[in-house]
From Swiss-Prot:
UniProt propeptide residues: 20-47
PROSITE patterns in the record: I_CONOTOXIN
Keywords tagged on the record: Disulfide bond, Secreted, Signal, Toxin
This protein's name: Conotoxin Tx11.3
Keyword presence, Cytoplasm: no
Subcellular location: Secreted
Entry superkingdom: Eukaryota
Disulfide bonds: 39-53, 46-58, 52-63, 57-70
Length: 71
């Protein structure tokens, strides 16, 4: 039990010692910066082709399947 607590304590303290800001390493920080880490499926909102999953393209404001390659 003491080993587990020590390990967790090291995980909490280590980022502050290395100088890395916690918001740069967490999903909540990604949400604050607007980074999503996931892609949009068919019919979901997009701004660029890279926002869409797989072979979907951003057609207007939603991801759609197209027979021609994305731009």
């Amino acid at each position: 039990m003491k080993l587990c607590v020590t390990f967790l304590l090291v995980l909490v303290i280590l980022p502050s010692v290395t100088g890395v800001k916690s918001s740069e390493r967490t999903l909540s920080g990604a949400a604050l910066r607007g980074d999503r880490g996931t892609c949009s499926g068919r019919g979901q909102e997009c701004k660029h082709d890279s926002d869409c999953c797989g072979h979907l393209c951003c057609a207007g404001i939603t991801c759609q399947f197209t027979y021609i390659p994305c731009k």
